[in-house]
Regions:
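Internal, glycine-rich beta/alpha segment that forms the wall or movable "lid"
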Residues: 44-45, 55-59, 74, 83, ...
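N-terminal beta1-alpha1-beta2 module of alpha/beta enzyme domains
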Residues: 1-79
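Short beta-strands and strand-loop turn motifs
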Residues: 4-6, 85-88
Length: 168
């Protein structure tokens, strides 16, 4: 059995203790995987149903810092030697897919294959609105982005004129 832990990339701990030192301690404690979470924008007010709470209402402090997931993964990878590094669920439709494919492939190559990735369509409509992405298209974007990521990672990113992304 493999056991993983979340490396905090939100709240006061990352700035106080450092993501790298926390990751190193977790790896030394025997964890096999180290995962962070992902949000780009946390709105002060959200009406979206929060799927991780008992009452469906958001419970975060809008002033709480959320550090970028790719940066957190990179710091975690740099501070460890053995543990798998990843994002529990990255909101892929909010990312530029070719840039993100390169970032993840770079982390994977530079860690000797320790990168893992969980992706999802996202649940926070206000985050999509803040970033100018149509929330209603998140599922279609996820499908399109995943196909493009796979093509980039296998070395054959064919030109495409997708519904949401064009690759010349």
């Amino acid at each position: 059995m493999r056991i993983s832990s979340k490396v905090p990339n939100s709240g006061p701990l990352p700035a106080a203790l450092g993501i790298g030192p926390m990751a190193a301690r977790l790896e030394a404690a025997g964890f096999d995987g180290l995962w962070c979470s992902d949000h780009i924008v946390m709105p002060a007010v959200a009406e979206s149903y929060y799927p991780f709470g008992d009452d469906g209402k958001v419970s975060w402090d809008p002033q709480m810092p959320w550090y970028d997931a790719v940066v957190a993964m990179t710091m975690t990878a740099a501070a460890t030697a053995r543990a798998e590094v990843g994002v529990a669920v990255l909101v892929l439709p909010l990312r530029q897919p070719v840039t993100f494919a390169k970032q993840v492939a770079s982390i994977d190559a530079l860690t000797g294959g320790r990168m893992a990735l969980g992706v999802g369509a996202g649940w926070l409509a206000e985050e999509f609105e803040a970033l100018g992405v149509d929330y209603a298209t998140r599922g279609a974007r996820l499908d399109e982005w995943m196909a493009l990521l796979r093509d980039c990672w296998t070395g054959f990113p064919a030109a495409r004129d997708g519904a949401h992304y064009t690759l010349p």
